[in-house]
Each structure stands twice: as C-alpha cells, then as structure tokens.
C-alpha cells in the first residue's frame, strides 16, 4: 500500500507499569498533553494547505495493485525519524535489510530474494550490482555492500514488492527500490518563493550525530535547491547497548581480556567469536544541487549534481586470520546530469516528454591493514595492506513520453507511455597487495581476479492504461532489454596476470583469449493488470509481472586459482527470471480501507557457484632446467551455473481505520495493521533464507486538530523461523581425503530464532510556526532478540559471521536494546 500521511500516524501505547522510564520516554509521552503555542491565523491557514498538497501527491498515484508496495516521502522520513535504509522498512513486514558488516548493507530482501535480485536505482539510474563471489566473501577483503543514498536528500523512496523488471529492469526479480532526490518544490510552501530548513539529530543506537540544511527558491523563470547532510556515528549496538570506545580501534587492543567480552553469569570467553559488534566509526557527507530554467511555458531545462562519501574505520576482531586487522573503507557517489521537460500546451496527443542525460560513478574501496606485534613490545605495526577498489561508471540517456487519454468508441480510453534508455557502463576491480617489512622498503604487486568489463545496455518499454468501463480497467506493458558485455584487460590487469607463472592456469586462459569473449543477451518481459469494481467500495485486482537479472560481470568473467580451488569463467550464463502472480481484494469506505493480497512467484535459472572435483594436470617450472614439471592433481572446480529454480507464495493483509469520529475527538486517530505470511521452496529441497517469517505490525496514531503535534506508536510482532522453513545445503566429508557431498539439513543456528514483540513510541511537537521537536523511544520494553536477517547472514561465509561451536557469537547479532532518537528542525 502506498502509505499516505494518515497511514504514518500510528500509535500503540503499552502499559508502563513496573517498567523503568527514561527521560526521553517521559518527553515523548508529555508531547501528547502539551498545548499548542499560538500561531497567527495566516500561518494556521498555510499548514493545512501544505498538508493537503502532500495528500494530493498520493492521490495522483495509480492505485497500488499489491498492498506490499510502499511509498516513503520526505515528510514520512522526517516524521518517523528515519536515518537509514533499515529505518525505511522498519514497519513493512514484506521488506528487510541485511547487514554487510563493515561495508554497510547488502541491499533489500523482498519475496525471498535479496542482493542483486532486488533492483536499486537513483533518479532512474541503476545502482551497481554487488560483485563479490562466495569464494572470496569468507576473507572479508572485498567491498561487499550495495550503495544506498542518504535519506536526507530524498524526496521519495518507492518500494515495489513482486517482480518489477518492466519498470526497473535487471535485478527486479523479487522487487525494486527507487530513490528520487528532492526538488525545489519539496522545500517551498505552495504560496511562497523561498523555503528551507536546518536540522540536527541524534540516535543513541549507533551514537550518530547528524546535521543538515536545505535551501530552495523559485520564480517564473528559475528554480533551484541545495541540500547538505553530515553524519558521524559508530557501529550499531547490540542488546547490551554499550557505548563506543575509541580505544577499541587500536590494533593492539586486548579484546580477549576485556570484561565486556565475557558473559557475566558464566564468565565464558571465546577467542574465535565476540559477543559485541566490531568497533566502527564512520563519517558521511552528502550534497544535492539542482537548477531548473523555464525557457518558456512548454520547455524546462535542468541541471543536477549529487555527491556522497562515507568513510569507515573498523577493528575487525571477528576475523578468520591471526593478524590484527583494521578496515579503512570508502563508499562514494558522484552523479551529474542535464534534463529537459516538454509540456506541450496545444497538443491533443502528447502530455509530457522527459529527457535526461546522467553520468554516475560509484566507488567502493576496501582497505585492510594487517598488523603484527613489535618484538619485545606492546605496540603493533602495519605489516601489510590489501587495497581493493571497485569502480562502476555509468553514462545513461533516458527518454520518457506519456500521452493524453485517447478516447475510442468501443475500446475505452487509452493512455500510452514509452520509456527507453541507453547506458554504457564500465566495471573495474583492482587487487593490490603491499608487504611492509620491519626494515627495508615496502613491496607492492597486483593480483588478477578477472578482466574489467564494459557493457552497452538498451531497453524500451511500452505501456497502455485502458479504462474500458466505469467498473473495469486494465494495464498492459511490454519491455525489451539488450545487454552487450565487453571484457577488456587494462594496464593493471595485464601487470597482474603477467607476473604469474607461465604455467598458472589463469594466465594460460588469458593467453588463449578466454577473456576476450564478448557476450550478448536479451530479455523480453512485461506486465498485465486488471481491476474490477465490485461495488462503489470494493475492488478486485489481478496482476501478472515478470522479472529478470542479467548475470553480474564477476559471475561471467572472474577467474582465480589457489590451494586446489579453481574459479573458472562462464560466458554461457543466461539471465535469471521470475514470474509473479497477485490477486487482491481491496475496500475503500468512509473511515476504513483494507487490502488482502495473495501472491505466487516462480523463480528460474538461479545462478549459483557449482562445485565439482576433477583430476587435472598442474605444472611448475624447474628453475635448474627451465623445463615444466607436471603431475595430476585433484582440483575443486568452481563455476557460476544456471542450476536453480524456486518459488515463494503467501498472503499479505493490511488496513487503516479512522476512528476519530467514533472516539468523538477533534483530532485525527487512526489504527493500522499489516501482516505478511510467506513460504518458499527450491528444486534442491532447500529454502530461500531471505523469506521473512510471519511478521505483523499494529499501530494507533493521533494528530492534533491544528496539526501542531502528533504521537505515534507501533507494536511489531517478529515471528520465529521454523526448522522446516530453513533447510540449507552444506558440503560435508565422511573422513580425511574423502569427497565432499551436499547434505541438506536445517540451518545449524535455527534454534536461536525466537519470536519477539517490539514496541516503539515516537512523536513531534511544533514549538511555534517554524520549529519542530521530534523524539522517539524504540524497543521501549528492551526486548532481547536476534532479527532473522542477522541470523540468516551467518549461513553465508563472511568475515563478520564468526560464531564458535558453543554458539557464543550469536549474542553479538542481537538487535539494539531500548534506544532513542531526537531531532530538532527549523523550517522557513
């Protein structure tokens, strides 16, 4: 459901009897009883106009087919104290976010899939795929996060639940997330020409301080906006809520003997797993600027620029190597572009044409410094650096055109739209190693993991919205995508491969032209929906939609061999595909609205790493004779293959009830509830761990008659994952030198999955006409639980997934305990 302003104002007030109350809890509760500070009559008249303008934006949206679809606006982000991608989906039981440790998040999980199988785009330009193979994830040296724009710069975030490649292209297997940056109109009230804000905030779950400002202006000829945000924070705390300690970023810090790293009741310690999150400190700066020039009544020329950079420093205590490890990582976005909007005044056919040219560069740098103890001293020195920058460049031209409604005698009214894009991308990954001896000069070299890859991407989509009768309407869409992969060896690639032995299998592949193979692939997909009004209040809807995911460049071209494991390229991969069915019943009454949706999604041609044992010749050079010495070896061959099918199905219920008249109050009171139930299975007998267990949200909200204060609270039910829904395949051997076999069994930590009830209370109060205080207490009753997304991440090899054989490390993955946020905003 696209959430409107009433949907956000949700409150559930639990009993506080017998519970300790923090100062902030009292502050938030007090907001409900404070009287409004008087404004002038003119200012009071302006506020409802601004509120109604926001509602109008929602009303212009097409009715959502699936109740799981969700729209977050800048107002929602501000009112709900949203600071991160996890906050965006806090109350959406369909969608979740998985951590990527020191690298941020792994993107969103929707309909049982996550990572690259959920498409992300910023202002219509795709954000790059994660390019890390499972074989390298265990070491933690590769940048594994997916880029996420800072929420402070966003006007809207739209979540589409279910296959959505018609709108979002590659990756929208389970759904998509579209980020739209702010425009001047987001900061300017309807009756003014200048607007802006200054904002400061604090969150104690990660000790983040944030400061932001925005300024926008407009007249008949020009519109402009500039928006800036700065954040400083630390690792997200677990249930213990221990404060950040900067000393823990010292590579010499003694975690083993720190009393915080043992259980108070048992005194148990572990040197293979921590019970607190790894220490981390980060700084984010982001800036948005836009300028629009109205050339005449029909034409507008625009310029836009976005820049964002996050620097992180972390001490990776939970590692798989002996040496102390400090991560110094960077995620950076640079985006620039020009746009043109054409709104013809006299045309009887064209409604609007938008053309945009954008250049986007996203860089993810994983820098890992390893340290060793100085002999006879307590100090540590840097003995090595692993430098892993990934760079993704995109230049994209997009054209969108929409027609006015075209009336026909027998086939109803048709509204046509065409959307076409052409993009050129360039992906580069560098592996640089530096060894720093205690004396002498450092030495550096490059390792080869695969070529750089350019892509030419073209797509065109055509849609027809048909209003057949007053009761029946339908939408039909068809889309074509074409991908052309072009691998190439840059100078660093050549240096890396040419330093290897001439008998190194990957070098032999290079010399035989294995990395010169271009690859073309295409996909045809679409969508179909039909809506029928059963009565003035009830409507039934059916939607069919398709999704696909073009293989990541790393899946097609990565190559590496080490310790009997050989990762081989595969240019014969096909796109993954999905087919989604949804059937909904929705009702819209005077004070009540609801939607019930049943869904079924079929996934095919899943790409996974396939293991196989082969006996192959391996050679090395006898330096005394210069001749090769060869012998047969058992090699574990790893290659990405289209080997999997899966399906997910379930039910989503949601509704909003306006009880203001029933309660006989002058303000607005709404009750809302959402529930999501989903199951899945694969053709291998395993499960899609990204499928969420039973989740539900119940809320009750109040907003004062003058719109000058509101109080909200939610109760979230987070269900446990059952063993029969969490089966995984693991490689096991019956003994030394025995072959490994796939064994399917419940995930080994499934017993740690427990259900939980989590209460949140938050609100805001206008302190005059321009100043607003916002505050919230989250996990009010200090529930201790491990979110399913945290627990399932342990099923994947990762530097941050260290849990010892007694399960002690699970403690580290608990959600934050009782925590609070507070913010102060001055708007003008």
Briefly describe each language-model feature range.
Residues 127-161, 289:
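Short acidic/polar hinge/loop motifs at secondary-structure boundaries
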Residues 204-311, 332-336, 410, 468, ...:
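Transmembrane beta-barrel wall of Gram-negative outer-membrane proteins
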Residues 320, 326-346, 449-457, 512-525, ...:
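Outer-membrane beta-barrel signature, preferentially recognizing the C-terminal barrel domain
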Residues 294-308, 331-504, 527, 531-533, ...:
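Face-selective signature of the C-terminal outer-membrane beta-barrel domain
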Residues 467-474, 482-483, 599-603, 612-614, ...:
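Gram-negative outer-membrane beta-barrel transporters
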Residues 548, 599-605, 609-611, 717-733, ...:
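C-terminal beta-signal and adjacent terminal beta-strands/loops
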């Amino acid at each position: 459901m696209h959430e409107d302003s009433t949907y956000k104002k949700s409150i559930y007030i639990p009993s506080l009897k017998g519970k300790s109350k923090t100062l902030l809890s009292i502050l938030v509760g007090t907001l409900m009883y404070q009287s409004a500070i008087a404004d002038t009559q003119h200012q009071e008249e302006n506020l409802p106009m601004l509120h109604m303008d926001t509602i109008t934006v929602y009303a212009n949206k097409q009715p959502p087919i699936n109740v799981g679809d969700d729209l977050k606006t800048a107002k929602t982000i501000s009112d709900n104290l949203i600071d991160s991608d996890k906050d965006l989906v806090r109350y959406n039981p369909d969608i979740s976010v998985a951590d990527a440790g020191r690298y941020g998040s792994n993107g969103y999980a929707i309909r049982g899939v996550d990572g690259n199988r959920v498409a992300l785009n910023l202002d219509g330009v795709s954000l790059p795929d994660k390019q890390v193979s499972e074989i390298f994830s265990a070491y933690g040296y590769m940048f594994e996060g997916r880029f996420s724009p800072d929420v402070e710069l966003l006007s809207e975030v739209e979540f589409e639940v279910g296959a959505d490649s018609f709108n979002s292209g590659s990756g929208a297997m389970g759904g998509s997330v579209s980020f739209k940056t702010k425009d001047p109109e987001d900061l300017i009230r309807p009756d003014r020409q200048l607007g802006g804000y200054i904002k400061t905030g604090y969150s104690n779950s990660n000790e983040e301080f944030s400061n932001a400002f925005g300024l926008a202006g407009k007249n008949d000829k020009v519109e402009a906006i500039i928006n800036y945000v700065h954040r400083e924070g630390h690792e997200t705390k677990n249930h213990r809520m221990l404060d950040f300690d900067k000393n823990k970023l010292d590579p010499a810090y003694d975690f083993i003997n720190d009393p915080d790293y043992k259980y108070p009741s048992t005194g148990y310690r572990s040197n293979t797993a921590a019970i607190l999150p790894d220490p981390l400190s980060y700084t984010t700066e982001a800036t948005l600027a836009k300028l629009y020039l109205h050339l005449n009544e029909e034409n507008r020329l625009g310029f836009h620029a976005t820049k964002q950079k996050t620097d992180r420093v972390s001490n990776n205590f939970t590692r798989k190597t002996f040496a102390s490890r400090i991560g110094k990582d960077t995620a950076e976005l640079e985006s620039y572009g020009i746009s043109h909007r054409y709104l013809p005044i006299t045309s009887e056919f064209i409604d609007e044409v938008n053309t945009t040219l954008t250049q986007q560069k996203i860089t993810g740098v994983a820098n890992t410094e390893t340290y060793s103890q100085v002999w006879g001293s307590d100090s540590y020195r840097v003995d090595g650096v692993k430098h892993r920058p990934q760079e993704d460049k995109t230049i994209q031209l997009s054209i969108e055109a929409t027609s006015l409604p075209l009336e026909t005698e027998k086939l109803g009214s048709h509204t046509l739209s065409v959307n076409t894009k052409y993009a050129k991308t360039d992906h580069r990954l560098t592996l640089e190693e530096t060894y720093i001896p205690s004396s002498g000069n450092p030495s550096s070299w490059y390792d080869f993991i695969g070529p750089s890859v350019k892509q030419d991407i073209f797509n065109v989509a055509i849609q027809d919205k048909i209003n057949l009768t007053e009761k029946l309407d339908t939408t039909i869409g068809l889309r074509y995508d074409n991908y052309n992969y072009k691998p190439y060896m840059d100078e660093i690639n050549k240096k890396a491969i040419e330093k290897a032995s001439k008998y190194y299998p990957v070098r032999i592949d290079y010399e035989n032209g294995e990395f010169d193979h271009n690859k073309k692939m295409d996909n045809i997909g679409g969508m179909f929906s039909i809506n029928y009004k059963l009565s003035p209040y009830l409507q039934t809807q059916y939607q069919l939609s398709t999704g696909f995911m073009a293989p990541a460049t790393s899946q097609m071209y990565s190559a590496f061999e080490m310790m009997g494991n050989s990762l081989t390229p595969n240019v014969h991969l096909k796109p993954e595909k999905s087919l989604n069915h949804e059937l909904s019943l929705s009702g819209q009454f005077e004070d009540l609205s609801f939607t019930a949706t049943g869904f079924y999604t079929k996934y095919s041609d899943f790409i996974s790493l396939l293991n196989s044992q082969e006996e192959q010749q391996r050679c090395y050079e006898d330096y005394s004779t210069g001749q090769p010495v060869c012998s047969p070896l058992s090699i574990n061959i790893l290659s990405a293959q289209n080997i999997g099918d899966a399906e997910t199905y379930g039910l989503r219920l949601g509704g909003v009830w306006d009880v203001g008249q029933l309660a006989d109050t002058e303000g607005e009171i709404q009750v809302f509830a959402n529930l999501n139930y989903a199951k899945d299975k694969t053709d291998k007998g395993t499960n899609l761990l990204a499928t969420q267990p039973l989740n539900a949200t119940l809320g009750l909200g109040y907003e004062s008659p003058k719109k000058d204060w509101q109080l909200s609270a939610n109760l979230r039910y987070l269900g446990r994952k059952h063993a029969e829904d969490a089966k995984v395949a693991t490689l096991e051997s019956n003994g030394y030198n025995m072959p490994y076999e796939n064994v399917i069994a419940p995930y080994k930590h499934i017993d740690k999955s427990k259900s939980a009830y989590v209460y949140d209370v938050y609100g805001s109060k206008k302190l005059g006409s321009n100043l607003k205080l916002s505050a919230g207490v989250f996990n009010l009753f200090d529930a201790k639980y491990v979110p399913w997304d945290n627990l399932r991440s342990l099923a994947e090899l990762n530097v941050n997934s260290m849990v010892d054989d007694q399960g002690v490390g699970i403690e580290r993955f608990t959600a934050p305990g009782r925590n609070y946020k507070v913010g102060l905003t001055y708007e003008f």
